[in-house]
Amino acid sequence: MVKLRLKRYGKKQQPTYRIVAIESSFRREGRAFKEVGIYIPKYNKTQLNVPAIIELLKNGAQPTSTVKNILLRAQIVV
């Protein structure tokens, strides 16, 4: 099953996350199918590729709870 999940990047104490489509059995830092956004919690900043996210959701990708909250704040129907 494909999931929309956060993949951590950045320095210590300054995390940056990429929102990726990845197989649910792969580890968090594993190889992703597609990168569809960036989330920086320190500044509460998000950058999303909305058409790609909608396409993945239509094809059955399931967002994790955190990604679901990010999408709801961006007013993307989940």
UniProtKB/Swiss-Prot annotation:
Keyword annotations of the record: Chloroplast, Plastid, Ribonucleoprotein, Ribosomal protein
Molecular functions (GO terms): structural constituent of ribosome
One GO term (biological process): mitochondrial translation
Cellular component terms per the entry's GO annotation: chloroplast; mitochondrion; small ribosomal subunit
Domain of life: Eukaryota
Subcellular location: Plastid, Chloroplast
Keyword Chloroplast set for record: yes
InterPro entries xrefs: Ribosomal_bS16, Ribosomal_bS16_CS, Ribosomal_bS16_dom_sf
UniProt keyword annotation of Ribosomal protein present: yes
One Pfam family named in its UniProt record: Ribosomal_S16
Family: Belongs to the bacterial ribosomal protein bS16 family.
Protein name in the entry: Small ribosomal subunit protein bS16c
Gene: rps16
